[in-house]
Amino acid sequence: MLVAVANEGIVKEVVLPDGTKVWLNNAAMLKYPREFSEKERNVYLDGEAYFEVAHNKEIPFYVQTENIKVQVTGTKFDVCSYKGSNSFIARLIEGSINLLTNNAKEEKPITSLTKGKYFSMENGKYKTGEMSSNNALAWMQGIYYFDDVPFKELLDKIALYYNYKITVKNPKILENYRCTGKFKDLDGIEHILKVIQKDHPFKYNIDNEHNKITIE
C-alpha cells in the first residue's frame, strides 16, 4: 500500500492509479494500492479529503473510514472522518454516493446522497440534509469554517491542523460551548483561541516550544 499524508499547513493533491484526484486536508492520511484490482477500487482515509473519482461503472470506488464506507462509481464529494473522533461527515458536490457501515462481518446500507446533500454522524447519531453553502470546501483555499460546532470538535480539529496537544482541565467548557467562525490557516492556533474567547470565557496557556496548550 502507498501512503499520502498532508503535512501541517498544506493541502496535498494525489492522483490515484485510475486517474482519480484527491485533495487531502491538513493532517489527513490516505492509503491506496499501487494498482487497483479489476473488481473494485479501495482506499482508506483518516482525516478530511475531497475526491473527484474517475468514472468506471464496472469497477466501484470505495472510501474506507473508521466507521463508515463510501461507495461511488464516479462523482465529486468531501469526506471528513478522523480516527478516534466518533464523527463522520460526507458532502456531495456532484453525482451520487452510497454510505454503508464499515463492519468486517456485515456491511449494512445507511443512506444514499444526491447532489447538494450531506450526511453526518456524531456519537452514533445520524443526520442528513441540504448543504447550506460552499464553505464545506473552504479548507481547500486554506480557510477553516466552523458552523455551530461543539467546542470539543473545534479543539480536536485545530489540534490536528496545527500539531498541538490540547488539554482541557474544566470539562464543563466542552459540554456548554458551541462555536461558529471562519479562520485562515495562516492566522495560527492562538488567534483562533483568542477569537473564541470573545464569546466564551475561558483561559489558556500555550507552550509553543513543546506544542502544548492547556485550557481552563
Where are these regions (language model features)?
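A residue-level detector for the "anchor" residue at the start of short, highly conserved motifs
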Residues: 1-216
